[in-house]
Amino acid sequence: MKLSKYISIAILFFSVSAAFAQQLPQFTQYMFNTISINPAYAGSRETLSVVGLHRSQWVGLEGGPETQTLSIHTPLRNEKMGLGISFINDKLGYENFSYLYADYSYTINTSANTKLAFGMKGGLTHYSLDEELLNDPSVTEDPFFNDISNRWSPNVGAGLFLHSSRWYLGLSAPRILNTDYNKGSDGLRNFVAFERISYYFTGGYVFNLSETTKLKPSALLKATNGAPLSFDISANFLFNEKLWLGGAYRINEHAAAIGGIADFQISKQMRIGYAYEYPISDIAAYTSGTHEVLLMFEVFKSKRIKSPRYF
C-alpha cells in the first residue's frame, strides 16, 4: 500500500475528528463498561466481573477505528478494596494503541445507602505503526517511522465513584501523563498521535416507572486538552429485570452521532449487549455506521447480591 493512501486516510480522519487519536476510544455502551475509564469502579459490582467489548467504528471506511476491550475486576474479602486488570486494543488507520493497566479501589460508606470509592490505575501503553506501512518501499528507509513505532510508555490514572443502589456519579482521568509519539519530527507531526490527559464525568439514575419497567438516563462528558468536548447522553428502559432498550446521542464538534442500545440478561451470570451508532457529521457520507457488541460474565454470585445490577 502506498504511503499516499495512508496519508489520505489520516487527512480524512483529522478533518472530521480533530486529533481523534489523542483520546482514549469512545463507547456507546459506556454505562455498562465503566471500568475501562474509571479505576474506582473496580469491585463495585460486589462479585468477580468479566467484561469484553468489540467496536467497529465507521464501517465501510477503510482504516476506520476498531477497538477491543477486556476487563476483570473483583472486590476483596473485606469488600472495601477492589482489584482489576484491563486491556484495550485500539486501531485507527495505520496507528495501533494497546493499553494494559491494573486497577485498585478503596471504598468508604458515606451514609447508610451511599458509598464513595477512590481508585488508581497504572500500566503501560504500547504504540506501533501498521506493518504494511512500515514495509512500504517509500517509507522503509525513513528513520522517522522506525523511531516512533513499537514504543512502550508508562502511565497512571485516578478516579472517584460515588453511588447508591439508584444513582451514581463518577470523575476520572484514566491517563494522567502526556506522551508525544513524534520524537520531535515536525514534518509529519500532524499525522502522529499525542496521548493527552482526558477527564471523564459520568452520572446516572434509575427511575421506577411500574412494577416491571424502569428508566435509567445516564450521561458522560469527556474533556481532552486540544480536542473538542464530547457529551454523551442516553436513556435506557429496563423491562422485567431482563431486557434493556434505549437510545444514545453524542454531542461533538466533529463526531456527533445517534444510536440505539439493546442489552439482555441471559442469566444471573451472563448478559449480552449490542449498540448501533450512526454519525451525524461529515463522516456520514463515507460509512454505514458503527457496531458495538458487549459480553459480561459474573461468577461467585451469592444470594445477597442483587441481580441484575443497574450499573
Question: PLM features: what roles do these ranges have?
Answer:
Residues 1-8:
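Bacterial N-terminal signal peptides that target proteins for export
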Residues 1, 21-22:
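Absolute protein N-terminus
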Residues 22-311:
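Subset of outer-membrane beta-barrel
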Residues 8-9, 19:
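Cleavable N-terminal signal peptides
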